[in-house]
Amino acid sequence: MRATRRQFIMAGAAAAVAVACTPTVPATGGRACPAVPGLGGPTPLPAPGSTGLVDEAWFSARADSFLEVGTASLSGGDINNVVAHLIRARRDPSFTWDPSQVSHTLVSGDPFRDTDDFELMYCQWALRLGRGVLPAETIAGIEAKIIGARYRYNDPLPAGTVDNKWFWSENHRGMFACDEYLGGLALPDATFTFTGLTGAQHAARTRQVVVDWLKERTKFGFFEWHSNTYLKYSYAPVLTLLEFAEDPEIASLAATVADTAMLDLAANTFHCVFGASHGRGYKAGKLSYSGESSFNTCKLLFDNTDRPFNNGNDIGPLYLIGQSRYRVPEAVRRIGASNDVAVVRERHGLPLDPHEPYSLQPVAPFGYDYADEKNLPFWWSTGALTAWQMVPVSLAAAKKWNLFDTELFQKFAKVKDFLDTSPGLAQVVVR
């Protein structure tokens, strides 16, 4: 039988650090070596505290140290600060705070604003943890936000309206799928604004999208190579699914992807700084550790730096702490905490050769047909918006869905004239 990807990571990583761990039954309080998991198909997640996962008392202490920062004061208009308070209250019955001070307008009302999917993900946590705790008006506003969201670029759009959201990068694809699936499950009987579908129908149509995106990560890794900005926004929706999705297949896949992301951090950090070569890196993250989006996650898990947590509302560690069913493998923690020198060999992405010989029907790798619009989100998430193989379908979709009117596509608007002449000519020019 074949091991699942998660079992492979746990077993392989455990073998790699076996020389550094104590026997399975520690003699003097040292942590036990992770047990090699069995083989087979997807299985229920091992409960927190199980052999092979981080020590539960250790993790609880790390969580407390982070939440002390995040809940030092209440910012009633900051949804992530509110979620930090909700998570701490769920973990610690002795913790007291005043939910009545939370704003009734905790979320924005603009469904066409870029990064709206981020806020919709935050809503999943605030809604589920906040029902019966937060003011009724706040909960009603969150529910209205979920119902009134436009989750897909090809969902109906009122005439004359421009939707400036970016739907297609790796993290946005995962986040929108998470938002729609969990939002639909949370409000199954509500009628959603743009589609007229019920929440249950939204969840049903999105389940396979979620599964496919997770499987892509297990097969191809992360397209945004070691991004010290965006990796967090790829694993945050995975952690959200892990906590709130009841589907066994989704839970198993999400655990695999979460382990992979945490191992990616562990193998490529130095004193909690994600210091590998980067794709999609920005100035703030290049000049200082404090600008990296995963610093606090690494500080929580690996804690091999004296630098303090610098953002108590950071969703990376917050969503790990908020897990009731998932914990990081102990072997991954040890890799991240180790100062040993090692060679890391990785492969992320898939081959797309922009210099291959021109063809009217180029053959796509792994069966992701360039000419099929259903594969457009996949290819665009690899960064292949302007690859010559994708030009015809990219131009057609952009025109069909009025994407050239959006802020992020306006710079490409001049190329739409090729649609009225020859998309094939556009391919040749681009190549």
What do these predicted regions represent?
Residues A186, V209-D212, E216, T240, ...:
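Alpha-helical scaffold segments in carbohydrate-active enzymes
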Residues G30-M175, L187-P188, L197, Q201-V210, ...:
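Ser/Thr/Asn(+Pro)-rich, low-complexity disordered segments
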Residues A190-F194, L241-L253:
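Inter-helical turn/loop segments and adjacent helix faces that build the functional surface
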Residues E180, K232-A245:
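Alpha-helical scaffold elements that line and support the substrate/ligand-binding pocket
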Residues S252-L320:
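Extended amphipathic alpha-helical segments with heptad-repeat/coiled-coil character used for oligomerization
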Residues M1-A15:
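N-terminal secretory signal peptides and thylakoid transit peptides that target proteins
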